[in-house]
Amino acid sequence: MSEINKAEIVASNARAPSDTGSPEVQVALLTARINHLMPHFKTHMKDHHGRRGLLRMVSRRRKLLDYLKSRDADRYTSLIQKLGLRK
């Protein structure tokens, strides 16, 4: 994932112009990294060390989403819809 791509993700999910640490931005960046890694794991199914890192990212995203849901349900639902995480 390139720096330009990261900057676009931050800009599209930031609550303020200089916002880089809000849960929305963190979840969006983790989602982009997870989506970027998925083709690798479809090809290299036995990469268990890499899969452990992927599962850590998924777990961290889940914790951030739980935090956001407990703090502000409206922001949570809008983020879920924007990123397409729930069907």
Swiss-Prot record:
SMART domains xrefs: Ribosomal_S15
Keyword check for rRNA-binding: yes
Keyword flag Translocase: no
A GO BP annotation: translation
Pfam entry (one): Ribosomal_S15
Domain of life: Bacteria
GO molecular function, a single term: rRNA binding
Positions of region (Disordered): 1-22
GO terms for cellular component: cytosolic small ribosomal subunit
Keywords linked to the UniProt accession: Ribonucleoprotein, Ribosomal protein, RNA-binding, rRNA-binding
Function noted in UniProt: One of the primary rRNA binding proteins, it binds directly to 16S rRNA where it helps nucleate assembly of the platform of the 30S subunit by binding and bridging several RNA helices of the 16S rRNA.
Known partners and oligomeric status: Part of the 30S ribosomal subunit. Forms a bridge to the 50S subunit in the 70S ribosome, contacting the 23S rRNA.
PANTHER family: RIBOSOMAL PROTEIN S15, BACTERIAL AND ORGANELLAR (PTHR23321), SMALL RIBOSOMAL SUBUNIT PROTEIN US15M (PTHR23321:SF26)
Family: Belongs to the universal ribosomal protein uS15 family.
UniProt-recorded name of the protein: Small ribosomal subunit protein uS15
